[in-house]
Every structure is written in structure tokens, then in C-alpha cells.
């Protein structure tokens, strides 16, 4: 009797739950979601990503549309592949999409996410960004470091002159990393710590951090598999590398404090701000260390990567190289002398070349992910709070509806009469992003890139050893924190002095 009653109660409860679920499903508001490819339980759409996610996501967008919803494990990912959809994300609803998703690597490596590049949106982030822009990245501050850029570019030119005299090839990829790192080191820290092993290996630590930031910790997306990040050493590596970088930078900061200098490098500027209170906001010691790290990551992942793609495309397109050389050499006398930043200001074709390389090879083809903080409609679709957003700048920059049937071609001429700039106002061209999260270091990066390119091309002719592509360097990519060349660019400089 008791058993019969128990079974009856269980069946009644089950039937009630089923009816309730059916009722709630019927009465629930219908949600209009973006198109989605079929996904596998547990991993979602992770199996559809290749080693070049910007390309695989572009291919998916051609089938499912410029706004599609994927799932990386349990995390919903909105992929944006058109300028119209990007406008709604970065302009119309910019504030709702201004946050960053949580990441094990960012939290462990970047001061708990208390930095400008990766930090969550909020009052603290706004204050930190304001400190960065108003004190470190103003046009006046960038201009004040012109002498540093001139000295470091000239040092690189001397290496190239020696290579030219001995008919030797140079690894331009490595030269560009050294150049941008030395400039960043002098601007940020007051001297060149990059190659100084006695300082504790800044080069080693920054590269380790960049390598870890490019990793894909599966536990962020599939919590049930978080144990993999533990047993493969990822978790412990984050702790080790972050501590080593922090200890190294503590020594650098102490050197500045003991020297008592008032040299206008970023550390001294930030130390002076640390002593002040601005509306109750105070810069902490760790904030200084990791704002400097932002500078190194931004400098290496933008400037050096851009320079190697510029030289790659110019060597592959000799007619473009010749046009640029003619522009530079027709205005500079005598040949072989250093080309100053003021002389570069009116070089229209040089600026067009840089813009075109940013279009076809954006260093960050997938703009750093954003996190939606409240429900919103985008292009008529319902997007739920907690959705991560990936904007495929690579796809937008190659859209034939915007750029014409030759969108895949390298053609600097398309920018000669264009009003496009790097500030993301027109969402068809967003190499530095747009909105509240746009890269704040645009002027710092472009000042170095323009003067470096003018001297590289104005003072030397360039060639490469014949390979599988003839006398052209390949275009193979390596996807990481940025997208650089898979193979280093090795080229022969020939001085025209």
C-alpha cells in the first residue's frame, strides 16, 4: 500500500513538472537569436576553429551571415563580420559592450585584470585610462620622445649599412621587435632594459607573458575540463611568470626612486602621480608595473608586426616599392641622411601604404573580446547579457561590398583620396578598434612606424633569396596575441647612399 502510494506521488509529481515545463515554454517570450551552426555537446563550436580563427570565422560568416552566434564550450560568442553590425556594437550600444570577459590568463598575468588593455570596464578602469592618456600618450608627450625614436632608428640603420657593405641578409622581423622594444623601454623605463640580462631578463619575461596570453585555457570555456590547465602546467606557469615580471619591475621602480631623477619617462611620471590623490583615486605600485607591461605588449604586437607586414608587401609588390621610394627620395637630400619625422608629414603615398597594410594585415584581426553586460537587440536579434563578442576586423577589411572586387589585393592607391583614419569613426576600417575600448596608443605607434618606414625604404633597396614563391616572401601567418609572420622576414638591404 505504501509502495503504491509512493509510486503514485512520484508519477503525479513528474507529470506536474512536465506540464509546467510545457506551459512555461508556450508562454515564454519568443527569443530571436542570430543564425548558429550546429554545435557539439560540451565543446560547442570549438571544433570549427582552425589555427587561424579569423579565417575560419570568416568562412562561417559567409554561410551563416555577418552576425552569428557560436558557443565556445558553454560560453555564447557573438561573431560580428560586417561594418553595419560593428556600428551597433561599437557605437550604438558601446557602453553595454564595453566590458571584458574574465580570463584565467589575464587575471593571473595582468595584475588581476587591473590594467588598461584587459581590465573590466568601470570607474577604476576609466580613471586608469585617463591617467594613461592625459599623462603618457598626449601628442605633446609623444612628440617629446622624437629624439629617442631618431636614435633607435639610426642604430638600426647602422646595422643595415653594415649588412649592405657585406652583402649580408638581415632578419627584419627580429630587428623590428628590438627596435620597438628599445624605444618602448627608453620611453617607459628611461633606458634600454630589453636586452639587459643583468636587469633580470625583461625580454624573456615579456615574451613569456605574450606567449601565455595567446594560449587557450580550456577551463575558461569548459569548466569540467579545467583540470587540463592544471596538469599541463598552465596554471603554475602563470603564477611563476607573473611573479618574475613583478619582481623585475619592482627593481626598476626602486632604481628610479633611488636615483631621484626627474627624467620624463613613464615610470617617473607614474611615480609622481602615485604620490597624489586625484578625486580619491590613487595609483598603486602594481598599477605602475602593469601599465608599463601594457606599453610593451602594445608596442610589440602593433608596431613591429605592422612593420614586417609592410616590408613583406612592398617586396612582393615592386611597383608599390618604387612609387614609395620615388616619393621619399625626391624630397630628401642628400641621399643616405636620416629622414626626420617632420619630413614624413607630407608623404601621402607612405601613409597610404601603411593604411593599406593595416587593412589587409590588421595586427589584431579579431579585436580583443568584449562582454555584454545587459540584454540588447542587435540588427533585430536578441543578445543576452553575458555573451562575449568577437569583431572580425579582418573580415570587415576584406568585404567586397565596401572595398570593391579587388578587396583581396594590396592596393595603397585606394587610400590616396580617402578620409579614413585610425580612430574608428568609420566602422569599415578599425585597425585599432573603436569606441571606449579603442587602443589609446595610436599616436605613439604611428610616430615610430612612419619614420622607420621612410628610412628603411628611402635609404635602401631590398631583395630576398629566391624560394618557393620566387623572389617574393611568403604570406604565412602565425596567430597569437597578434597575427605576425609565421616565418621571419629575411631580406638583403642595398644602400643607395
Swiss-Prot record:
It comes from the Eukaryota. Its EC number is 1.14.-.-. CDD domains: CYP71-like. Its cofactor is heme. Its main location: membrane. One of its GO terms (cellular component) is membrane. SUPFAM superfamilies: Cytochrome P450. It is found in: Membrane. Pfam families: p450 (PF00067). Keywords: Heme, Iron, Membrane, Metal-binding, Monooxygenase, Oxidoreductase, Transmembrane, Transmembrane helix. Heme binds at residue 439. GO terms for molecular function: heme binding; iron ion binding; monooxygenase activity; oxidoreductase activity, acting on paired donors, with incorporation or reduction of molecular oxygen. PROSITE patterns: CYTOCHROME_P450. The chain crosses the membrane at residues 4-24. It is a single-pass membrane protein. Belongs to the cytochrome P450 family. This is Cytochrome P450 71A18. It comes from Arabidopsis thaliana. The gene is CYP71A18.
